[in-house]
Amino acid sequence: MYRNTMRSASRPVIASLRSSTIRAAPRRFASTAPADKPRSFKGSLVRLGLAFGAVYYYNTSPIFADEAISKTVPAPAAFSDDDLPTVDSIVEEKRKQIKAKSEETAASSKTPESQQSNPQTAAADGSPAALEEEAGQQGAFNPETGEINWDCPCLGGMADGPCGEEFKTAFSCFVFSQEEPKGMDCIDKFQGMQECFKKYPDIYGAELADDEDGAPTPDFGDEQPSGEPTTAEVKSNGELARETKDKTAADATKFDDSQKPAESKTPAKTTSTSTDSAQKPAVDAHRDAEPKSDAETASSGSRMVQDVAIPIEKPVNDKYWQDMHKSEVQKKEVTVGITQAHDATAANEEIKHIERQEAAKKNAEKKQ
């Protein structure tokens, strides 16, 4: 009973509401745009957030990613610094190549005669530079450890002879020398080795013959090694400077005792100023005018010097008083000290050493 009454009472109310809503919402077609309504701030934020989210998803999602390239470039081979060639490895490889080439050439061109004469040739060509080059090629010297194999046949057995210790000292000094040119600080040791060779000419005859056939002794002219005092001119009055002569003789004796070499030394050559000047025709007349007694006192140690030279030729320019007047100027005595003579032995050794280096370079170029 109560339900029926409620339904009957609610029906007119529901009908009125439906009619009011239909009247309030006007009808429109699907193609027509809805009426513009003001949008709220929250709705704008939601729309912006959705737009940013869509863009982010498009950029990061693998669904929209481009397809991978089918053909890819292979990655470069990975290697460490240990695999790279070093300077030592390159030098060692070159030495092995040189050693292999030398062994091939030696095996192809070797004959029984060359095998017999090989030790003699090595002994004759036993210059420090050549021995060092050959020792480096045949493995006698190891630059990494600094060891020298004295039993190497490239040394010609010189390390085992009676002068073996002298040879080892000189050769090792030359190998480790840092001077330029190389070996300049080892001249004394090589001189000692040569002196030892001279004591055994039957064993080291080839070495001595090679040294004798080397470069000739250089001509130093008036500056040849001499143990005697320098010859000087005489006084015009013919008197000797006795005090100067005694002092010069004493100095010459000291100089001979201190500068005399061990065995081999070039003989002293005394050259007087009067003898050298005799070759000049312009001075011959002046020399002939002097008495013989003045010429005999040429080794007094004093030198006569003029303040102004006397012109010999005819006047060239009349404006200069030297060409107009020939005036004899009084000579005065000047004491000349003893000049130290050159050491010809050391000079010869240096020249021979340089020639040996050049010969070693030529041999190395030929072998290459």
UniProtKB/Swiss-Prot annotation:
Q: Report biased composition (Polar residues) as residue ranges.
A: 105-121
What does the domain comment read? Answer: The CHCH domain contains a conserved twin Cys-X(9)-Cys motif which is required for import and stability of MIA40 in mitochondria.
For bias type Basic and acidic residues, the affected ranges are 95-104, 240-263, 283-295
Q: How is the cofactor bound?
A: Cu(2+) or Zn(2+).
A GO BP annotation: protein import into mitochondrial intermembrane space
Gene Ontology CC: mitochondrial inner membrane; mitochondrial intermembrane space
Q: Does the keyword Oxidoreductase apply?
A: yes
Motif range (Cx9C motif 1): 163-173
Stretches in topological domain Mitochondrial matrix? 30-47
What this protein is reported to do is described as: Required for the import and folding of small cysteine-containing proteins (small Tim) in the mitochondrial intermembrane space (IMS). Forms a redox cycle with ERV1 that involves a disulfide relay system. Precursor proteins to be imported into the IMS are translocated in their reduced form into the mitochondria. The oxidized form of MIA40 forms a transient intermolecular disulfide bridge with the reduced precursor protein, resulting in oxidation of the precursor protein that now contains an intramolecular disulfide bond and is able to undergo folding in the IMS.
Q: Which residues lie on this side of the membrane: Mitochondrial intermembrane?
A: 66-368
Q: Where is the composition biased (Low complexity)?
A: 264-280
What GO molecular function terms would the record report? protein-disulfide reductase activity
Residues forming the CHCH domain are 160-204
What does the UniProt entry say about where the protein is found?
A: Mitochondrion inner membrane
Q: Which UniProt keywords apply?
A: Disulfide bond, Membrane, Mitochondrion, Mitochondrion inner membrane, Oxidoreductase, Protein transport, Redox-active center, Signal-anchor, Transit peptide, Translocation, Transmembrane, Transmembrane helix, Transport
User: Its quaternary structure?
Assistant: Monomer.
Q: Identify the residue span(s) of motif Cx9C motif 2.
A: 186-196
- The protein's name in its UniProt record: Mitochondrial intermembrane space import and assembly protein 40
The protein's required cofactor(s) are namely:
Cu(2+); Zn(2+)
